[in-house]
Curated annotation (Swiss-Prot):
Subcellular location: Cell membrane
Name of this chain's protein: UPF0154 protein LGAS_0795
Source species of the chain: Lactobacillus gasseri (strain ATCC 33323 / DSM 20243 / BCRC 14619 / CIP 102991 / JCM 1131 / KCTC 3163 / NCIMB 11718 / NCTC 13722 / AM63)
Keywords linked to the UniProt accession: Cell membrane, Membrane, Transmembrane, Transmembrane helix
Membrane-topology annotation of the record: Single-pass membrane protein
A GO CC annotation given for this chain: plasma membrane
Pfam family, one: UPF0154
Amino acid sequence: MNLGLAIFLIIIALLIGLVGGFYGARAYMKKYFQDNPPISEDMIAAMMAQMGQKPSTKKLNQVMNMMKHQQQK
């Protein structure tokens, strides 16, 4: 097999793999976020209410900031 042809086919295969991997990962993440949406302030307020706490705006902001800080680590 010609060396130039082999290199060309390897590069084409890599490009096809990159594009396929990108779209596969994108579809997986879309499905994941549909099945498991990120937690929102409303969900935190509902959890606090179920635990018997009054969900004030200050408490909600504190919890959201703590969660954002944990995600950045």
